[in-house]
Regions:
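Tandem repeat scaffolds
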Residues: 1-141
Length: 141
C-alpha cells in the first residue's frame, strides 16, 4: 500500500512516501530535503541532477532500503542521507556524489560510473566521501 504525506514544517514542505513506485521524471533535477522514502521503488527513474539532502531511504522497522536499480543517477547528489540496504544495481551514475551518508549493505553491482568518449577511451567520475560503506557490494563495477 502506497501512502503520501506532506508535512508543513515552517518554510519547507517535508515529503514522506511509503511503498510508492516513483514515476520516471518525478524528481528529475529537483532539490529534495529532509524527506522520507520507505520501501520506495525508484527503478528506472531519471534522477539526473537531483539533490537529496538529509533524506531517509532506509526503513529501520522493516530493515529494507529503496530500489534504485537501472535508475539514471547522472550528477545526482546524496548528502547526509541514509541509503543503507539500497539497491543500486545497474545504475548509470556518472558524476554521482554520495557525501556524509550511511550506505551500509548497499548493492552497487553492475553500476556504471563511466562515459565512453571513443571506442577505446572512457571517462569515469564518482565522488563517495565520508560515507559508511560497510558490507556494500561493488562487484562488476
Amino acid at each position: 500500500m502506497a501512502s503520501l504525506l506532506y508535512k508543513n514544517t515552517g518554510i519547507d514542505m517535508t515529503l514522506a512516501l511509503v511503498g510508492e513506485k516513483i514515476d520516471r521524471n518525478r524528481f528529475t533535477g529537483e532539490k529534495v530535503e529532509n524527506s522520507t522514502f520507505f520501501n520506495c521503488d525508484f527503478s528506472g527513474a531519471d534522477l539526473s541532477g537531483t539533490e537529496f539532502i538529509g533524506c531517509q531511504f532506509y526503513d529501520r522497522e522493516s530493515q529494507k532500503g529503496c530500489n534504485f536499480s537501472r535508475a539514471m543517477l547522472k550528477d545526482a547528489i546524496f548528502k547526509s542521507c541514509d541509503l543503507s540496504m539500497a539497491d543500486f544495481r545497474n545504475v548509470s551514475a556518472l558524476g554521482i556524489e554520495i557525501r556524509h551518508c550511511r550506505a551500509q549493505g548497499a548493492d552497487f553491482r553492475g553500476a556504471s560510473f563511466m562515459n565512453m568518449i571513443t571506442t577505446r577511451t572512457w571517462f569515469c567520475s564518482a565522488y563517495i566521501t565520508n560515507t559508511n560503506l560497510s558490507y556494500a557490494n561493488f562487484s562488476k563495477v
